[in-house]
């Protein structure tokens, strides 16, 4: 039977920690972009043309960046799930008799 174990216990634990931090940070950033935080205007990819038609174009760009943050957070969540599975497989491997 083929094993799905491909990471050691330390790498898997590191993956869980980094994934948890990435999910928390990106969800918070997504929320702040979604409420159109003025502090984050430097991180919105706008051009001079976007300022001509009022704030609606800028708000749409804020929401697009917000969606990108939520998508990245979901990818970090998947990576955290994979790392958790690797931790479980490593613990199971310790108790198996060879």
UniProtKB/Swiss-Prot annotation:
Binding partners and assembly: Interacts with the proton translocation complex V0 of the V-ATPase. Interacts with ATP6AP1.
Protein name: Ribonuclease kappa
Enzyme class: hydrolase
Gene name of the encoded protein: RNASEK
Family, per entry: Belongs to the RNase K family.
Topology in the lipid bilayer: Multi-pass membrane protein
One GO BP: pH reduction
Described function: Endoribonuclease which preferentially cleaves ApU and ApG phosphodiester bonds. Hydrolyzes UpU bonds at a lower rate. Regulates the activity of vacuolar (H+)-ATPase (V-ATPase) which is responsible for acidifying and maintaining the pH of intracellular compartments. Required at an early stage of receptor-mediated endocytosis.
Gene Ontology CC annotations of this record: clathrin-coated vesicle membrane; endomembrane system; vacuolar proton-transporting V-type ATPase, V0 domain
E.C. designation(s): 3.1.-.-
Organism of provenance: Bos taurus
Stretches that traverse the bilayer: 13-33, 65-85
Entry keyword set: Cytoplasmic vesicle, Endocytosis, Endonuclease, Hydrogen ion transport, Hydrolase, Ion transport, Membrane, Nuclease, Transmembrane, Transmembrane helix, Transport
Tissue-level expression: Expressed in brain (at protein level).
Broad class of the protein's primary localization: membrane
Keyword Transcription regulation belongs to the record: no
The keyword Transit peptide is assigned to this record: no
InterPro entries: Ribonucl_Kappa (IPR056552), RNase_K (IPR026770)
A Pfam cross-reference name: V-ATPase_su_f
A GO term, aspect molecular function: RNA endonuclease activity
């Amino acid at each position: 039977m083929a094993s799905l174990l491909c990471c050691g216990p330390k790498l898997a634990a590191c993956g869980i920690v980094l994934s948890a931090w990435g999910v928390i940070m990106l969800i918070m950033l997504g929320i702040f972009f979604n409420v159109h935080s003025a502090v984050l205007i430097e991180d919105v990819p706008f051009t001079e043309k976007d300022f001509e038609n009022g704030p609606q174009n800028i708000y749409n760009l804020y929401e697009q960046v917000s969606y990108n943050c939520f998508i990245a957070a979901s990818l970090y969540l998947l990576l955290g799930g994979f790392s958790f599975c690797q931790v479980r497989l490593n613990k199971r491997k310790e108790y198996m008799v060879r």
